[in-house]
Curated annotation (Swiss-Prot):
Disulfide bond entries: none
Residue positions with a glycan: N215, N251
Organism name: Saccharomyces cerevisiae (strain ATCC 204508 / S288c) (Baker's yeast)
Phylogenetic placement of the source organism: Eukaryota, Fungi, Dikarya, Ascomycota, Saccharomycotina
Taxonomy, superkingdom: Eukaryota
Designated name of the protein: Mannan polymerase I complex VAN1 subunit
Chain positions with Phosphoserine modification: S25
Region (Disordered), start-end ranges: 22-48
One Gene Ontology cellular component: endoplasmic reticulum membrane
Topological relation to the membrane, as annotated: Single-pass type II membrane protein
Length: 535
């Protein structure tokens, strides 16, 4: 199942002029088409809906009508009271997972009209059906009926060529793929980007994810968003919340929604909620707070070129808890399934005009808004930043998170020769001593963020890749490729096909901290000790 959203320029004006309630793409009809409803004059409406005398209702009919009105009134009153008791929240789910603005204030949200031409290029071009229909009886008939002759004046010829091009554009689009190779200065060359985000049981982190998306300083009109929701638990609200957030994102009202949500959450938060925050480094907590506090960049609320939402399951049955996802025995199975999901999303969302593909996890907590152009500027075919995560102070405040970005070692190559063909080497586990150089471990907090190193394997938290490598056959192996799978195998495959794979050791983004079972036990133990000491 796929759902698609896109924004057009001058939405309000065109909607009022044309009587349209939804934007229309080249796959439908043009924004310039006249509303067929306006063609009916008042006389025809009067004829169609001529008054017809009705027979006098019986007492039984009157009784039934009055009873129906009473039932409707009671139900309406019940729904109204229920609405008020829900704190006036327009769209919500239990436990505060998704609160999308109060019904009272949502009417006053400011929306944005868009003028950038990139919102309307390629498959979003304006195609006017009235112009196209002129050619229904052939070009010769068009010339005679429109201009009275097949010999055109320069002015008439200009109009003819313009309308003929619109006819061709309605069915044929020509792409010179050499124009979409991916440039290191993509900001200046206006490179289009496909931004892919896989989601599973992710309702709780969607606000964080969308705030990061809005904070991207790469022009939003050049970014197409593609989400894949898969294998969620029964009762999970990820898909519904994602659709609701996306609509507000494309209306330019999502930041206003988040202000309201944050206020509600703050008023409902209890002292025991996210108890682990008491044990986090205060400096890091302040950095997170500053990252999501105004002022934001001037295009923070600007909608993206398009949003596509896909839902497809791949048979993933592994739990989403930290301990479940990171158990060594499930890593091979899990990564092959994730490889299938990534390949499916790429195949369905990648367009000929995309120059870059940016893969991003939803649960990144801190990341520069300029990350796309920062990675792009290094001109690698595949490039990743360093990924760390914060820790409670009793665990050292921070640690490397993504160990899947590495340089190959002789020890790992020798290890692979001892394994079965279908075995998957997993980094960071004692069962697989590879002795590789990991990008995470060569980080210097004060190092040059522009320094780049060549890599063999890459992690999947944040990957920028040139779109041409996918067109040329590189994929996220959903099978064992040189004893690896998914993103690590993706890096190895890209390198084997002659592409440059690299990473930035001193350019760090931060993953959210997810307490493990052992961490939660330690925090509970410390809390009990505090209570004993205070008694």
């Amino acid at each position: 199942m796929g759902m698609f959203f896109n924004l057009r320029s001058n939405i309000k004006k065109k909607a009022m002029d044309n009587g349209l309630s939804l934007p229309i793409s080249r796959n439908g009809s043009s924004n310039n088409i006249k509303d067929k409803r306006s063609e009916h004059n008042s006389n025809s409406l009067k004829g169609k809906y001529r008054y017809q005398p009705r027979s006098t209702p019986s007492k039984f009919q009157l009784t039934v009508s009055i009873t129906s009105l009473i039932i409707i009134a009671v139900l309406s009153l019940y729904l109204f009271i229920s609405f008020l008791s829900g704190m006036g929240i327009g769209v919500s789910t239990q436990n505060g997972r998704s609160l999308l603005g109060s019904s009272k204030s949502s009417e006053n949200y400011k929306t944005i009209d868009l003028e950038d031409e990139e919102y309307y290029d390629y498959d979003f071009e304006d195609i006017d059906p009235e112009v196209i229909s002129k050619f229904d009886d052939g070009v010769q008939h068009y010339l005679i009926s429109q201009f009275g002759s097949e010999v055109l004046t320069p002015k008439d010829d200009e109009k003819y060529q313009r309308e003929l091009n619109m006819l061709f554009d309605s069915t044929v689009e020509e792409y010179d793929l050499s124009n979409f190779e991916g440039a290191p200065n993509g900001l200046e060359t206006r490179d289009h980007i496909l931004l892919c985000i896989p989601l599973r049981n992710a309702a709780d982190v969607l606000p964080l994810m969308f705030k990061h998306l809005m904070n991207l300083t790469y022009p939003h009109e050049l970014i197409d968003l593609a989400f894949l929701v898969s294998d969620c638990s029964e009762g999970d609200t990820t898909l519904d919340a994602l659709i609701a957030y996306s609509r507000h994102l494309q209306n330019g009202t999502l930041s206003q929604i988040f202000q309201e949500i944050d206020a509600v959450i703050d008023s409902q938060t209890k002292g025991t909620d996210k108890l682990y925050l008491k044990y986090m480094d205060e400096g890091y907590i302040n950095r997170v707070h500053q990252a999501f506090s105004p002022p934001f960049h001037e295009n923070y609320d600007k909608p993206f070129r398009s949003v596509q939402i896909f839902q497809k399951d791949f048979g993933q049955v592994i739990g989403q808890g930290f301990s479940d996802r990171h158990a060594v025995k499930v890593q091979g199975i899990r990564r092959k399934l994730m490889g299938r999901a990534r390949n499916w999303l790429t195949a369905n969302a990648l367009k000929p005009y995309h120059s870059w593909v940016y893969w991003r996890d939803a649960d990144v907590e801190l990341c520069p808004g300029s990350v796309i152009q920062d990675l792009m500027s290094k001109n690698y075919d595949v490039i990743v930043p360093n990924v760390w995560r914060p820790l409670p102070t009793f665990l050292g405040t921070e640690q490397p998170y993504d160990l899947n970005s590495w340089m190959e070692s002789q020890e790992a190559l020798a290890l692979a020769k001892t394994l079965d063909e279908d075995d998957v080497i997993v980094e960071g586990y004692a069962e697989y001593p590879t002795w590789r150089v990991h990008l995470a471990y060569i980080r210097d907090a004060e190092g040059d963020p522009n320094e780049a190193v060549d890599l063999d394997g890459v992690g999947g938290v944040s990957i920028l890749a040139k779109a041409k490598i996918f067109r040329n056959g590189v994929q996220f192996p959903a099978f064992t490729f040189e004893n690896h799978a998914e993103t690590e195998a993706f890096g190895k495959m890209a390198k084997k096909m002659g592409y440059r794979v690299g990473g930035l050791p001193h350019y760090t983004i931060w993953h959210i901290y997810e307490p493990s079972d052992d961490d939660l036990k330690e925090i509970a133990s410390r809390e009990r000790e505090k209570r004993r000491q205070s008694e």
